[in-house]
A protein has these predicted regions:
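A conserved beta-strand-loop-helix scaffold within acyl/acetyltransferase catalytic domains
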Residues: 1-50
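Short loop segments at secondary-structure junctions
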Residues: 19-22, 54, 122-126
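Short acidic (Asp/Glu) patches
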Residues: 29-31, 64-68, 99-106
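A short, internal acetyl-CoA/4′-phosphopantetheine-binding micro-motif in the GNAT/acyltransferase core
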Residues: 46-56, 85-86
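Conserved acetyl-CoA pyrophosphate-binding loop and the N-cap/start of the following alpha-helix
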Residues: 55-67, 77
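Conserved active-site alpha-helix within GNAT-family acetyltransferase domains
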Residues: 74-79, 84-110
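C-terminal "cap" of GNAT-fold acetyltransferases
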Residues: 104-140
């Protein structure tokens, strides 16, 4: 990885699935303050989802995502976002493709486009909008 990364002002968690004393799967979860249609919104971002090959197709990733969603709800967060090339793995967890134009800073330059790998899950009663999503800063 190059660059200095970016600051995460909210809570951070690593969700692990254990097989005995070995990690068999994990995901990273953090909160991020963004603007959605110009209005402040705090949302959860999920990334780094990895499941060891010999325990795949056993619902391990689904249980990790359920745990991450529960943690976000506990913090009063209504939306979880992730970026994935293959949407099939996340649809069963309630994720749908995002249609939002997304603004962020990458390598010191402002980027703004619709990223077709973005997915969102509504964790409460509020509905997601297709308005501009401004990530308010750097991404990795």
């Amino acid at each position: 990885m190059q660059g200095e990364g970016y600051a995460i002002p909210g809570q951070v968690a690593l969700v692990l699935a254990m097989g005995g004393d070995h990690v068999v799967a994990h995901l990273a979860l953090y909160e991020r303050n963004v603007l959605l249609d110009g209005e402040p919104e705090r949302m959860g971002l999920i990334g780094g989802v990895v499941v060891r090959a010999d325990v795949r197709r056993q619902g391990v990733a689904s249980r990790l995502i359920e745990a991450a969603h529960a943690e976000l709800r506990r913090h009063g967060i209504d939306f979880a976002v992730l970026f994935a090339l293959d949407h099939r793995h996340y649809a069963s967890a309630g994720y749908v493709p995002m249609q939002n134009e997304t603004c962020f800073i990458e390598d010191g330059h402002v980027r703004r486009f619709v990223y077709r790998g973005g997915m969102v899950a509504a964790l409460g009663a509020r509905r997601w909008t297709t308005a501009l999503l401004d990530l308010q800063g750097e991404t990795v």
